[in-house]
From Swiss-Prot:
HAMAP family: MatK. The gene is matK. The keyword RNA-binding applies. Pfam families: Intron_maturas2, MatK_N. This is Maturase K. InterPro entries: Domain_X, Maturase_MatK, Maturase_MatK_N. Usually encoded in the trnK tRNA gene intron. Probably assists in splicing its own and other chloroplast group II introns. Belongs to the intron maturase 2 family. MatK subfamily. Keywords: Chloroplast, mRNA processing, Plastid, RNA-binding, tRNA processing. It is found in: Plastid, Chloroplast. One of its GO terms (cellular component) is chloroplast. The lineage of its organism: Eukaryota, Viridiplantae, Streptophyta, Embryophyta, Tracheophyta. One of its GO terms (biological process) is tRNA processing.
Amino acid sequence: MEELQGYLEKDGSRQQNFLYPLIFQEYIYTLAHDHGLNSSIFYEPMEIVGLGYDNKSSSVLVKRLITRMYQQNSLIYSMNDFNQNRFVGHNNSFYSNLDSQMVSEGFAVIVEIPFSLRLVPSSEEIPKSQNLRSIHSIFPFLEDKLSHLNYVLDILIPYPIHLEILVQILQCWIQDVPSLHFLRLFLHEFHNWNNLITPTKSISVFSKENKRLFRILYNSYVSEYEFVFVFLRKQSYYLRSTSSRAFLERTHFYVKIEHLIDVCHNHFQKILWFFKDSFMHYVRYKGKAILASRGTYLLIKKWKCYLVNFWQYNFHFWSKPYRIHINPFSNYSFYFLGYISSVLINPSAVKNQMLENFYLVDTLTQNSITIVPVIPLIGSLSKAKFCTILGHPISKPIWAELSDSDIIDRFGRICRNLSHYHSGSSKKQSLYRIKYILRLSCARTLARKHKSTVRNLLQRLGSGLLEEFFTEEEQVISPIFPKTTLFPLHGSHKERIWYLDIIRINDLANYLDWS
């Protein structure tokens, strides 16, 4: 990292114009390899079959790749050979796949440089509180807002988009022309979009080898459309909230209207009147977005039509209307940040007395509830090889070579993180099933290591060996948002706690979304 910073400090005014030579530096691929080692514990290392070592850490392959890139047209021939022999199983196809993987990882590290430089705090900047970055701080806000809304648009952000659009969007952030040409070459040589994208997923994802590069391109695309989207929302709302009667100089009001029309595109002028609801909330979570409104069904339907036209005219692809669902909040639940959130309607009757007359008033109260998604978590555990798809615990063979303390520590850490992350759940009893799966999976992993049975292992080591799986999570010194709410579920009080020290999604929920 010091070598990379030293390279960038050579010419601070033209940092973005000198990214392309970094492609031919060996330490770039070392950084990409280190990033892979720091990934989630649920990802298993990818090894070259028959060679017995990690392909990303092989300096021989990296130097061979750099030498081939220096040669004229060698990379093009390599990619074409890979496209022609991807189903043959030939060695050339195998090594071309490794080349494309290393190029993708290395180029992703290079593209991240302009973004990371903007995140480096200066010495004069006032340090911000880390608690404001907590994921859990979003839920108290949603609880206060969602219970007052009527309709929600469940949006699946459309894909695919044209490859050239991706390059043009990234061009707004990076002015290095050779790097953009290299990216265009890399994408168009792998022009078979169906091989890079899995259309059956809720979000289009690259293959496992190109996932990091895709995330950069995808986030750039989302940032571009949200910039225009939020701009229209703010400008139209500000225009609406400042009436001409409030101005002493009416000319300023008309000048503002003319300026807004000049900034907006032609079709934007026709849809500004859609934005009349001041209780509109937009939340995006990876490949999905939620647009909630307090308005009528007609208003939310206009939003749906606008979004379809928005993607069509701005990004030149058709967004299918069935990807945007209109749902009333009264009978709708959505998966968000590892929770299932919904609005619970509680009917109640209030007895009032006026003089000698008694009468009952029926009222409806809406409460936002969050529960643990047990079935998705079991599916995530199944993909991580902790259990079957039906939830039957199995051993973890890749961890059987570790020491007993390391095995127990890994399983225990997963359970503690789950309890800590899902502390805001309204029904914590659902976590007991997940903990049971992890506890038995740990026992079977230990039994596999010692070539014994689970019963004999527990009799020999003691049943208290795995008691920490059912204990509470470790005490964390952190500001919290305690919220005790009375729910008529089983007639008991449910205490929910939102911690302000959680800055990343739980690995199980994150693994489920991106795998």
